[in-house]
Amino acid sequence: MKKIKSIVALGLVLAMSLTMWGCGNKDSATSNGGSSNKKSSSSAKTAEINATDDGTVLNIHCWNDEFQSRFKAYYPGYTEGKDTSTGTLKNDLGEFTVNWIITPSDDNAYQNKLDEVLPKNADASADEKVDMFLIEADYALKYVNSDYTLDVKALGLTDDDLSGMYDYTKTVCTAEDGTLRGVSWQATPGLFAYRRSIAKDVLGTDDPAEVQKSLADWDKFDAVAAQAKDKGYYMLSGYDDSYRTFSNNVSKKWVDDNKTIQIDDAIWQWVDQTKTYTDKGYNHGTSLWDDNWAADQGSKGKVFGFFYSTWGINFTLLGNSLDDQKGEEKVGNGIFGDWAVCEGPAAYYWGGSWICAAAGTDNKSLVCDIMKVLTCDASVATKITEDTQDYTNNVEAMEALAASDYKSDFLGGQNHIALFAEAAKKINISNMGPYDQGLNESFQGAMKDYFTGNVSKDDAEKAFYKAAVEKYPDLNAPK
């Protein structure tokens, strides 16, 4: 990957030293006890007092190792232990044992884990306290509007620290009382990633600008799907691939003010499209995250492309494209270099990870420092993107890379940051709600039986409502 010329090393050194001062230290941090375990909107004052600096063990909860990899690479002083679940950290704030508690998000397991440990955090022993946990946009408000997360300004972050972030990433974690309860190192606009070799065969070109002309709206996208089928390819891998382009463009939330579930017209458009693609053989009949879906992204795959946001390209698609998972990431290993991206038929976003400080943490200054280093500094953001191709949460850094000679070897020399920078401006989270992850998953699961012809659309809808109210007993199915 060709990197822009920058004095990143100096910037990193300065960032690490300055953040220690900005977030305080163990000698100067105030320690005030008391907290409420009631799960309701809490005030900034409540958040401010429910944290101390007495700890020597840092416990971090997450659902995969993405944040863990960022922490290890870009936060100074970490040494891994005998296995990946633990390590030691030594810096100006002290010496700490770091424990990684990773619970996969399948079947809501990660949220269930948080719901088990967070209410007990105030009374947990020092070495068992949750200090930090990660959340996703689909359920962020559930924790943001609770007494389990702390106001990041009460931790020590300032408006100036937060000024470089994309506004939507702050809105996602803004509580009803106006306090900011989480920060992210990444922004996650979405694009359409396609196989260059397949695009050449189907469209006669692999140039992103020309491919985009052929995929600029859903009618054009459908027409290319038919062309791809005639050439022996699938347009998409499975039932779920285009879901986020519809679910992130809804006109209403999943749940109305009366706690009644409502299905937006955009969601039904996805259902109709996916049924058509399934019946006509435009998709390969896979499900998101299954082995066949992953295999379709490799050298034996026959799929034109995948809808992916930022993390998906560098964290998932790249890995799935390699024949030798342990080999070098370069042209010649699988289909590395045979990918490109374009805007696709609709603007959308997908996912993202936010760092939250847990109420009751006894490592207040350390948590603040981690947030500041990994999410607030332009030089760190630039370095992460240059190294990993992730799209980081700093407007200045990303605009600079977008205008530079930055290139991704994985994407055949394309500067995908330029496209992501434009897509990020179009992100709309106005209809995000606390039930999004669970209802999205239940709806997709219920409709799979309709796509495969096992049940009618009406029966699939009924199955969805049944699963939804079982998962969320406080919700109602429409009468």
Where are these regions (language model features)?
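Conserved N-terminal structural module of periplasmic/extracytoplasmic solute-binding proteins
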Residues: 6-9, 18, 23-141, 382-385, ...
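Extracytoplasmic/periplasmic solute-binding protein
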Residues: 175-192, 216-262, 266-269, 303
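Conserved C-terminal helix/tail region of periplasmic/extracytoplasmic solute-binding proteins
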Residues: 396-412, 417-479
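Extracytoplasmic/periplasmic substrate-recognition and gating elements
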Residues: 56, 119, 279, 324-393
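Short helix-initiation/N-cap motifs at beta->coil->alpha
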Residues: 102-116, 216-220, 285-299
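Glycine-centered hinge/linker elements that transmit conformational signals in sensory
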Residues: 220-229, 257-291, 329-330, 335-340
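A ligand-binding cleft/hinge motif common to bilobed small-molecule-binding domains
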Residues: 140-144, 310-333
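Hinge/lid segment of periplasmic solute-binding proteins
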Residues: 44-49, 92, 108, 122, ...
